[in-house]
């Protein structure tokens, strides 16, 4: 019998990644025995592995996160190459966030949202309440000063949130989650980048057929040509992959 409450770990470039078989496995793992896990979720793709390689502070942030999972198809392929028996699939961060919100709405789990433009955040809250009856106990847009951080952490703690999602981009969101956990440790934190923009329709995500083919990165590149310099960096990751330097 398959144990959905457990998941193997696979190491890439010295970072242990959770090997989820699919979205159902991910949710059952995070809500094992009816208890939501506590810690930090970090989506790992090739670009994030490259950044971790070059930036010791980012690497330390990622290494400290309890739940690092394969968000990028290239990372999934590298795991399968290094560990041929691995039963691991891509769990896209945007999809995991939506599934987590749907589950939270079903179970009444208190949620605090951080990040995004004020209007996008307001639309995200409204849609979450309408679509899944999510119990949103507080929110804060991404426009706050460093001096306001401690007040934000105090608000999150006072809210009793069990899920805190932060849309500020990497590594800002990882830094904020790390610091907030010192004040409010008993929650599941998730960095979600631009997910609120996608969820509310302000940014168009790749069609499902592109996602299923593992070409979401190419769709984003064609839609946003300025990303080309970021994609060129990935040649280094391809060298790691094809030379087995994983």
From Swiss-Prot:
GO MF terms, alphabetically ordered: lipopolysaccharide N-acetylmannosaminouronosyltransferase activity
Cite the EC number: 2.4.1.180
Q: Which CDD domains match?
A: Glyco_transf_WecG_TagA
Its domain of life reads: Bacteria
InterPro entries per the UniProt record, alphabetical: UDP-ManNAcA_Trfase_WecG (IPR023085), WecG_TagA_CpsF (IPR004629)
Q: What class of enzyme is it?
A: transferase
Annotated metabolic or biological route of this protein: Bacterial outer membrane biogenesis; enterobacterial common antigen biosynthesis
Describe the function of this protein: Catalyzes the synthesis of Und-PP-GlcNAc-ManNAcA (Lipid II), the second lipid-linked intermediate involved in enterobacterial common antigen (ECA) synthesis.
Q: What is this protein called?
A: UDP-N-acetyl-D-mannosaminuronic acid transferase
The record lists the organism as Salmonella agona (strain SL483)
**Gene it is expressed from:** wecG
